[in-house]
Amino acid sequence: MKLKRLYPPQKSVNSLHSETGTRCEVAGCPPLRKEALLFFAGWGMDETPFMHNLPPNKDLIICYDYRSLDFDSTLLSTYEGIYVVAWSMGVWAASQVLPDSNLPLKQSIAINGTPFPIDDMRGIPPAIFEGTLNNLNEATLQKFRRRMCGSGSAFQAFLEIAPQRPVEELKEELAAIGRQYSELPLSTFVWNKAIIGESDHIFPPKNQEQAWQKYCNEIQRYDGAHYDEKILKENLAPAAASSKLLIAQRFTKAIGTYPHEARVQQQIARKMCSLLQQHLPAHSLRRVVEFGCGTGTYSRLLLRSFRPEHLLLNDLCEEMRHSCRDILNERVSFLPGDAEALDFPHGTELITSCSVLQWFEHPDAFFRKCENILNAQGYIAFSTFGKENMKEIRQLTGQGLAYRSREELTASLSALYDIVHTEEEVISLNFNNPMEVLYHLKQTGVTGTCNQSWTRSKLNLFCQEYERLFSPGKGSVSLTYHPIYIIAKKR
C-alpha cells in the first residue's frame, strides 16, 4: 500500500510538483497541520484524480495500490487527529488496516464500498469480480471506468485526470485483493457513516445496504454513480469543515460580549439545570460530559448543583478553555474539538448541553454514539431550538438553521432511549430597533454559518420590513427564541 501526502506548494526540496501546483510527498517533511484527512482510494487509483480536492484545514494523505496491505503509518505519526474517508475498494482496505493502526481517529466515512468487496449479498458478486479480473485489458478497463462514472460526460471528465498506472499492474492489484480477501479474517470495524450511490453499477446499492446493517452508525444515500466527483469533493474538501470553522470563528469573536448579551441562553441554562434536578436520581453523578460548553455558564451550574466527580467540558473553540479557566482543576477538564467527531469517555453517566445541538450536522448519529458511550443507567439531556427560533431573521433574509421540532427529536431518540421529560417554550426579546437585533446576534455569535452581505440599501430595507412586521408595541421590535428541553434515559 502506498501513502502520499498532498498540500499546496511550499518551499521544499523534498517534493514533487504537479501541473496544478499541488505538492505530493512520499516522506520526509513534517505535516503542515495538526489534523489529517486519510483517504483510501479505490482499485486502480493513484493521487492524480484527487489532487484538486484539498481539505481547507487538514493535510490530505492518500492510500492506494492494494497489492499489499502493509500499512506504514510514518506519515501519520505526529497528527493529533485523523479523519478517514474511503471509497470503493478502499473501504475494504481501510476496514482491514485501521483496527490495528492505533491512530487518533475522529471520524470515518465510507463511500460506495463495503468491508466485504467480493460477496454475492454484501459486495461485488464473485462471478463479476472474476470476470473483470480474467478479461482485464486496456479496452475493458475503459468500459469499467465508463460504468464507474455513470454517464458519458462524467467519463470524459474522469479521463482528463485518470491515473496513469499500467493495466498489468492493475491486474496484479485486483488479483491480490481477491487473494487477500479470501485469506484475511473479516473486519468488524464500525464506520461513522456509509454513503451509497443509488445508481452505483460497481457495488450494487442493495448489497451495500445489506453490508452496512451492523457496521456503520448512519447511512446516507444520493442519486448518483459509483464515482461521483461532487460527492468525493464534498467529503475530501467539505464545506462542512469550513462552516464549522466559521461557527468557531464567530463564537470566538463573541467571547467578550457573550456573557452580557446571551440573556436567553443563561435563562435556558438555569431551566435545564432545574429540570435535571427534578428528573434525575438524587445520587451524585460520577462522570459528566458537557458538549459545547462555551464560556461556561451551564458548566458552573452543573458543578454547583451536582458536584460530579469528574466533569469533561468540550467546545469547538479552543479559546473557550481560557473562559473556563477558573473552574478547571483535577475534577474538571477541557477537550477542544467537534463533538460530532470526538470520542468521549465510555461509562459516562450524563451527556448534556445547552443551546448547542442545533449546530450539529448529523444529530441522529450523535445520539447513537452517546448511547454507546453512556453507562447502563446513563442519561442524555439537552436544550436546543425549535422551528420558531429567530423566525423574524429567516423571514426577512431567507437564511437560518434547519431547526427540528420537539416531535422530530423525540422520535429520533426513542429507538435507543426512554424519554423522561420534554417541553418547549417561546421567549420574545424586545429591542429598540432592528439594528439592536443585529448587534445582539453578532455579540452572542449566533450568526453562525450565515453569510449575509449587507449593503446600505439592503440594510435599510431590512430595518423597514422588520419594524413593519415585528413591532409588538410603539418604539420596539421583537426577536423570538424557541427553546426545547429533552431528558432521555438509555434503554
From Swiss-Prot:
Would you tell me the protein name for this molecule?
Answer: Malonyl-[acyl-carrier protein] O-methyltransferase
Task: Write down the EC number.
Answer: 2.1.1.197
Q: What does this protein do?
A: Converts the free carboxyl group of a malonyl-thioester to its methyl ester by transfer of a methyl group from S-adenosyl-L-methionine (SAM). It allows to synthesize pimeloyl-ACP via the fatty acid synthetic pathway.
The highest taxon in the source lineage is: Bacteria
Give a yes or no for keyword Methyltransferase in this entry. yes
The residues forming a coiled coil are none
Which GO molecular function entries does the Swiss-Prot or TrEMBL record give? carboxyl-O-methyltransferase activity; malonyl-CoA methyltransferase activity; S-adenosylmethionine-dependent methyltransferase activity
| UniProt cross-references to InterPro entries, sorted A to Z | AB_hydrolase_fold, BioC, BioG, Methyltransf_11, SAM-dependent_MTases_sf
Annotated gene: bioC
Q: Where is this region: Unknown?
A: 1-249
